[in-house]
Amino acid sequence: MTNNVITRFAPSPSGFLHIGSARTALFNYLFARHHNGKFLLRIEDTDKERSTKEAVETIFSGLKWLGLDWNGEVIFQSKRNNLYKEAALKLLQNGKAYYCFTSQEEIERQRQQALENKQHFIFNSEWRDKDPSIYPTDIKPVIRLKTPREGSITIHDTLQGEVVIENSHIDDMVLLRADGTATYMLAVVVDDHDMGITHIIRGDDHLTNAARQLAIYQAFGYEVPSMTHIPLIHGADGAKLSKRHGALGVETYKDMGYLPESLCNYLLRLGWSHGDDEIISMTQAIDWFNLDSLGKSPSKLDFAKMNSLNAHYLRMLDNDSLTSKTVEILEQNYNKLLRKLAYRKEFEGNTERSTAAYIDIREDASTGLTYKLPLTVELPKKFKVSEQEIGYIKQAMPSLLVRSATLLELTRLAQIYLVDSPIIYNQDAKKIIENCDKNLIKQVIENLSELEQFDKESVQNKFKEIAAANDLKLNDIMPPVRALITGMTASPSVFEIAEILGKENILKRLKII
């Protein structure tokens, strides 16, 4: 099937949009776009207990952020049960399925018995071939597939090759529950057929499902879509990706400061290649993508490579875009903190602008930033970076950029230029300030106060003079000065920062000591 290609992404809305699921969506999107076909979105929410509206919105926002736009309306399985029920009854009428009245307790008893006997358990229902005339009337049955007892099922996988499963290893799976709702297996097959899916591209953890679904396809007499089961993403240690390996959800990567173009490029290269090309735009990916270039081995998540790739895409943005994105994150996280503080009753009535009146944003690890805000009786309702501060950030952007691999790192450095908020000192900076020569800092303040020209070169020359007068090297003076001005121990050039912020702001920060 190559004409009128239709692929689908079919996540279960039970949590975040997993990074592995995002890659699956990307591959389906690229394959469809490469063939001028359709990329459809289906929400598999048949499990009512685990499915949430919040998870659905997370899936939508994650796909939109990545730029993976789908065709047509979203299909919700929870709204299609009548279609599934009709399909199950059709199999029943054709002798391909049967009513089963066996209780779950009896099935569990048989399962436990097989376990005790160290036997592989396949449930064989006593109702498979019984005459309907003896069906009990006081028990609601399930509908089970009448899987062939003999022969085998062959999965023709474009990546894995031919995978043969003996029918004796496939149970008579439930198609319709006793309450009339469809199971995942039935819904998937009916939907793929009804939606006209031509190619199924998904993780190889679905390979066992494929055999069971193939049995349903055969029972209906449906044409089977082309199947491609791709290896899962693993952690750097080679184990299956889990929380201990780092971020799992797409939204988290967004919060960590990765660009969507960068993440798509990185995910594309996890299991697919085009020669030695590493930097691949979405346009190129659509032109080049094919199933023949998929790898058979699991790919390992590598944050160093991800950061390197993201740094490349950051440098492709112009100054205005970088400044705009940085300011947006600053405002989002400041306002997130304000909303959080609005519920902190222990700070009500605290009017002192002292250390005790600050709360560290590090308590909220999801932002990744280290803001502190003064607390007064009335917290500001909304924080906004001033036009002056935006100007500072824009001017400093080239030097901030060379030290950043993500927008979050860029934003952390940009805090240096927020002159209307208190300076933030990290722990190392605090130690340097506590142990520094206070008299030397006073000399620095006095000398800088006398400067008429406060450009980078003039400030640097003045520091050289101070160092010489005290028989010191420039590197002996700069650590505490840097700590006081930036709150950090590593930053862009202090002389450049001084030129951008100006004398008044620099002296204000130095005088804190």
UniProtKB/Swiss-Prot annotation:
SUPFAM superfamilies: An anticodon-binding domain of class I aminoacyl-tRNA synthetases (SSF48163), Nucleotidylyl transferase (SSF52374). Its EC number is 6.1.1.17. The keyword Lyase does not apply. InterPro entries: aa-tRNA-synth_I_cd-bd (IPR045462), aa-tRNA-synth_I_codon-bd_sub2 (IPR020751), aa_tRNA-synth_I_cd-bd_sf (IPR008925), Glu-tRNA-ligase_bac/mito (IPR004527), Glu/Gln-tRNA-synth (IPR000924), Glu/Gln-tRNA-synth_Ib_cat-dom (IPR020058), GluQ/Sye (IPR049940), GluRS_core (IPR033910). GO terms for molecular function: ATP binding; glutamate-tRNA ligase activity; tRNA binding; zinc ion binding. One of its GO terms (cellular component) is cytosol. The keyword Hydrolase does not apply. A motif ('KMSKS' region) lies at residues 240-244. Its main location: cytoplasm. Monomer. Belongs to the class-I aminoacyl-tRNA synthetase family. Glutamate--tRNA ligase type 1 subfamily. Catalyzes the attachment of glutamate to tRNA(Glu) in a two-step reaction: glutamate is first activated by ATP to form Glu-AMP and then transferred to the acceptor end of tRNA(Glu). This is Glutamate--tRNA ligase 2. It comes from Rickettsia massiliae (strain Mtu5). The gene is gltX2.
